[in-house]
Curated annotation (Swiss-Prot):
The lineage of its organism: Eukaryota, Metazoa, Chordata, Craniata, Vertebrata. Residues 116-160, 345-447, 470-492, 510-602, 916-958 are annotated as: Disordered. Residues 116-132, 536-545 have a biased composition (Low complexity). Residues 374-398, 470-491 have a biased composition (Polar residues). This is Coiled-coil domain-containing protein 187. It comes from Mus musculus.
């Protein structure tokens, strides 16, 4: 059915109809699908920007084909209409069909045979979204007017129609704001880019020629009728594009197709914008035509021709105006989305968030720095509101075109760097101005909100930085810059080589807000150079980044979002590094080594001091011990040791004790002043005569002066001992001789009885006892030899103690008395020894007889009477013996230098050993401990106590 029509149509229209026939078909205006579409359009709340009605386009097409074929060829040359005349914004048919009351003419053709369509730029942007109308064969007839009213027919579900609606919604969603502006159904990326690709492939064929409508007035009428609606919808879209879409999602894939599509639009944008004024004037004329319907039919063909040109170009002009606005809104939304994503990433990394919060400048500082900004940077950024915020179309078209063209670089890299935190120029206004070179940077954190951060060192080529190194001549004379190239001194210089290859293809930059940054030759007006010079001043020291070894402390600003795009993908996870502040005073390697050496030396010195202190403490302790040991040695070696037999250690020693002063050696003292005290005791085996006996050791003091010639204290001790033994032996020999002669004489019972009566009252025992003297073997030998033995022989016979025997009754013991007063001055001291039985360690008085536990040996008569003469003789003998013993004791003490013996009650071992004698009935074996119990330090030897040179009771009780 299309063959007869094609034969009449021009070539351009034939191509147009053939292209249009490939779209979706529609059965007619009043078909169920068309009525459903028109009824469903009443529910739509989306703004409609349609200019042409498909039936009006159909009428124009038929009129051009049948009546003015030549005119249609003249009106549609390829060079007059730009090939980008069709909007990518796919919309449903115009809602004006709901209330149009004007008659609409259509050819009397069958609505089901031939399909042809003319797409309006406002209604469809793809080849698949055309409204098809089938030509009917027959005369022209007038269509009934559309029914006005709120009645609504139910929409029938058609899969193809629904698919077409989805495509239209997807196109509208992408064109409006790429974030579902004015649409409710989300669109997939595949459908979006497939539709846009088909659009640009088929647009040149469609836009080659546009026919003039059959009735000239009808096209102008319908154009003027919906011009106000287009303006209202355009303003509404502008207002919607100004609203920041924080909750929308921008498609992040296949941005190269978007870039290519946008580039095709930019080519003919200048020619389109030149007709903006003409299009607006035609709008006014169309509005006037709408007021008088009769004037529509009286229009001349020339006016119809001009109106047709207006109707042909007006959709493109309006679309370009809206497209620029939409692109600006889309870029603003993308920037806002990047800011939101950067905020989320900063929230996930608290450490970077703290750095950003610390680096935010104060408003007053920003205002002051804006006033001091360079004019070149103001020219560089142009109008921030035009580039980054939605405007009302009042800015120049050239600036808008330059901004849109520069934004293509941003689209290309958005898919690669979505995760890196950025800062945009939105919300900062004219904050992009840098301080002047002579200004003092009070707040170094002013650069923290620049569109470029510290990562610009990784993205810009090195030649830009080298060119900045030549700006040192601009800096002030007080700056401390030493090296011209700061790029080699920065810690991130190694990373700049990575991004250099990514910037190789950007040799020529289009006009953009940061275009001056890409020109290394603009040294004096380069904000990088200005900031570098200003940052190099001494006033910024201590506040800028970590200085290099040359003490240069330049604080570099941050790169823009475009510059961040060349960062490798593997570095996206980590937050953008920024120059850290100075952590403190910087030290060189030599100073650090000196410090470490000083610390090590201090530690060694402390260890040495601790060792020295420990050694000193040990030395003091050793000195104290040595002092104690020395005193002990002096006490042992320098003092007299009691005569104790090494063979028979159980020797009981009695030392004479005086109540008065010591008498000179050899002088006889008063018997009343002499007492005895026990020093030590032990078990003595003795000889056959006295297996258990007492030994009286006359302790002659050792004279130090006399022993100086020998040089050894031990020799002096031996000399004193020998002297005491000789004196005692002589005295005992005389006494033994006298007593032996007395006892050998026959005594009468009276004498013996008197003697016993004199002796018994002095003893607590009831059994009388007769004292007898049993000389030991060595004394008998000495006496038999006539005293011809030398003192050396007496030393060898030290194991043979002197034995003084007397007989006491069993169980009798003389208690200790504090004072040993002599009741009878005529009585002497009887120190007796008993051959058998336990030994009593009780001291005896001079006038007392010490009782023992055994009876007297044979040969002594206990019940014999003694005459008075015998008693007197015994008394005289005892007195002589006491005088001799006293002289011997004085001699011993004077030679040994011993002080006067203290009172025996103040301390004596007799009290300690008295209970043992009572319990066991035996003499306690001699030990070293028995020589002064409780004071081992003061009694280092047996028999004596204390190292003071005195007797045992002097030190133990004093």
């Amino acid at each position: 059915m299309t063959t007869p029509l094609m034969g009449v149509m021009p070539t351009s229209l034939r191509a147009t109809l053939q292209n249009c026939s490939r779209g979706n078909q529609q059965e007619g205006l009043f078909s169920p699908k068309a009525m459903g579409r028109m009824a469903g359009q009443k529910d739509s709340t989306k703004p409609r920007d349609e200019v042409f009605h498909p039936h009006a386009a159909k009428d124009s097409l038929l009129a051009t084909t049948l009546r003015w074929p030549v005119l249609s060829q003249q009106l549609s040359p390829p060079q007059t209409v730009p090939y980008v005349a069709w909007s990518g914004n796919i919309k449903d048919p115009s809602p004006y069909m709901k209330g149009c009351s004007l008659p609409m003419w259509s050819p009397c053709l069958d609505t089901k045979d031939v399909d042809s369509s003319v797409s309006s730029g406002r209604m469809s942007g793809s080849s698949g979204g055309h409204e098809s109308c089938t030509l009917s064969h027959g005369p022209w007839k007038e269509r009934p007017p559309l029914i006005l009213g709120p009645q609504r027919q139910p929409r029938k579900s058609d899969p193809r129609l629904e698919q077409l609606r989805d495509k239209i919604r997807a196109q509208a969603q992408w064109q409006a704001s790429c974030a579902s502006l004015g649409t409710s159904a989300p669109s997939s990326a595949s459908c979006l880019y497939k539709t846009s690709t088909m659009l640009w492939r088929k647009t040149p064929k469609v836009t080659n020629a546009l026919p003039v409508p059959a009735f000239p007035g009808s096209g102008v009428l319908r154009t003027a009728e919906h011009r106000g609606k287009d303006r209202a919808s355009l303003s509404l879209r502008r207002e919607l594009s100004k609203v920041p879409q924080h909750h929308t999602s921008v498609p992040r894939t296949n941005f190269k197709k978007v870039k290519n599509a946008s580039c095709k639009r930019e080519i003919s944008k200048s020619s389109i914008l030149r007709r903006t004024a003409k299009g607006r004037g035609s709008d006014r004329k169309a509005a006037a035509v709408k007021a008088s319907p009769a004037h529509t039919w009286l229009c001349k063909p020339m006016s119809a021709h001009s109106d047709q040109q207006v109707s042909k170009h007006t959709p493109s002009l309006a679309f370009q105006d809206q497209s620029a606005t939409i692109h600006g809104a889309m870029e603003t939304l993308q920037d806002l989305r990047q800011q939101i994503q950067a905020g989320l990433e900063l929230t996930r990394s608290p450490r970077v968030d703290r750095k950003l919060s610390l680096s935010k400048p104060k408003p007053q500082n920003l205002v002051g720095k804006r006033d001091r900004g360079l004019q070149s940077t103001q020219d560089m950024q142009g109008s921030s509101k035009t580039a980054w915020t939605v405007t009302e179309g009042k800015n120049s078209s050239l600036h808008r075109a330059g901004n849109l063209h520069s934004q293509q670089h941003r689209k290309k890299a958005l898919a690669e760097h979505e995760s890196c935190p950025r800062r945009t120029w939105t919300g900062q206004g004219q904050d992009s101005s840098f301080p002047r070179p002579g200004s003092t940077p009070e707040k170094p954190r002013f650069f923290s909100q620049r569109p470029w951060s510290a990562l610009a060192r990784q993205t810009y080529p090195q030649r830009t930085w080298d060119a900045q190194g030549q700006d040192i001549s601009v800096q002030k004379s007080g700056s401390s810059l030493k090296k011209p190239s700061p790029f080699s001194q920065r810690p991130w210089s190694a990373l700049a080589g990575r991004a250099y290859s990514a910037c190789e293809d950007r040799e020529v930059f289009e006009p953009s807000p940061w275009n001056s940054l890409s020109r290394p030759h603009s040294a004096l007006q380069d904000p990088w150079s200005n900031s570098f010079v200003q940052r190099s001043s001494p006033s910024s020291k201590g506040k800028s980044a970590v200085p290099p070894p040359s003490k240069v402390k330049p604080a570099w600003p941050e790169p823009s979002q475009d510059l961040l795009q060349s960062k490798p993908a593997k570095e996206q996870d980590t937050p953008c590094p920024r120059p850290r502040g100075s952590l403190g005073q910087q030290h060189s390697s030599e100073s650090l080594r000196d410090f470490m050496r000083q610390k090590a030396q201090a530690r060694r010195q402390q260890a040495l001091e601790q060792k020295a202190l420990a050694a000193h403490t040990l030395e003091l302790r050793n000195q104290r011990l040595q002092e104690v040991y020395r005193k002990q040695r002096e006490a042992v070696l320098g003092k007299d040791i009691p005569v104790v037999s090494q063979r028979r250690p159980g020797i009981v020693t009695f030392v004479p004790m005086q109540s008065g002063g010591m008498e000179a050696p050899g002088s006889l003292g008063s018997p009343r002043e002499q007492t005895w005290s026990k020093v030590t005791s032990g078990m003595v085996l003795g000889d056959q005569e006295a297996p258990d006996s007492f030994c009286l050791c006359l302790n002659k003091p050792w004279n130090r002066i006399e022993t100086q010639d020998t040089g050894r204290p031990l020799e002096g001790y031996k000399q004193a001992r020998l002297q005491a033994l000789e004196t005692m032996a002589e005295a005992l020999r005389q006494r033994v001789d006298i007593l032996t002669t007395k006892l050998d004489k026959p005594t009468s019972p009276d004498t013996s009885g008197d003697l016993a009566s004199d002796v018994l009252p002095l003893c607590p025992s009831t059994a009388p006892a007769t004292p007898t003297l049993v000389p030991p073997s060595y004394l008998r030998t000495l006496m038999s030899k006539g005293g011809r033995e030398s003192p050396r022989d007496l030393v060898d016979s030290q194991a043979e103690p002197l034995l003084l025997s007397t007989c006491f009754q069993d169980g009798e013991m003389l208690p200790w008395s504090p004072s040993w007063e002599l009741p009878n001055p005529n009585l002497g001291t009887h120190i007796e020894s008993q051959p058998q039985g336990p030994v009593s360690s009780t001291p005896a008085s001079v006038s007392q007889v010490i009782p023992h536990t055994q009876s007297c040996p044979a040969g002594s008569s206990s019940h014999g009477a003694l005459s008075k003469e015998a008693i007197q003789g015994l008394e005289k003998k005892l007195q002589r013996e006491m005088a001799t013993l006293q002289a011997l004791g004085a001699c011993m003490k004077s030679s040994l230098g011993m002080p006067d013996a203290p009172d025996p009650t103040r301390g004596s071992l007799w009290q300690e050993e008295m209970p043992e004698v009572k319990k066991e009935g035996l003499v306690t074996p001699w030990t070293t401990r028995s020589c002064g119990k409780g004071e081992p330090a003061d009694r280092p030897w047996a028999g004596w106590s204390g190292g003071q040179g005195g007797l045992p009771w002097a030190s133990s009780t004093a």
